[in-house]
């Protein structure tokens, strides 16, 4: 019973990937903006940074799901734990990065740019595990 509850709580933590990031002190989710046009206001810049973060998160979620499905149960549990803790780290690291402009209208943009950048870096790490070559001793799955 306790193990099942723990599994559900860990799954909930990963399912709320975006929600955890949104829980930072940057306010509500910005309204969608056409970022193909040059944004004219700080609010539009903030919204475009958030949209970039959402795109980075979608790619990260895809890589995570693919890797999770390609490893055994023990590795899947470890991956879930690592990903949950990484999300918490990313949020705190970006809070630190934006602390110099906290309270300013640019703070949300700095936060979302940081989170998008870190998420793309994490996606690259997950992709490395997905595409490891034979002989790579850090490979956690069977090489292709």
Question: PLM features: what roles do these ranges have?
Answer:
Residues 16-18:
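N-terminal signal peptide c-region/cleavage motif recognized by signal peptidases
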Residues 9, 20-22:
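Leucine-biased recognition of intrinsically disordered, low-complexity hydrophobic segments
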């Amino acid at each position: 019973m306790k193990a099942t509850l723990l599994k559900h709580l860990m799954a909930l933590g990963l399912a709320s990937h975006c929600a955890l990031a949104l829980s930072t002190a940057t306010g509500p989710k910005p309204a969608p903006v056409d970022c193909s046009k040059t944004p004219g206001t700080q609010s539009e810049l903030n919204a475009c940074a958030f949209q970039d973060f959402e795109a980075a998160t979608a790619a990260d979620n895809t890589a995570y799901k693919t890797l999770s499905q390609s490893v055994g149960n023990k590795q899947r549990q470890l991956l879930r734990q690592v990903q949950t803790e990484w999300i918490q780290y990313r949020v705190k690291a970006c809070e630190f990065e934006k602390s110099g402009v906290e309270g300013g209208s640019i703070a949300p943009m700095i936060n979302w740019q940081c989170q998008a950048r870190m998420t793309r870096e994490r996606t690259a790490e997950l992709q490395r595990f997905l595409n490891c070559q034979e002989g790579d001793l850090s490979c956690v799955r069977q090489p292709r």
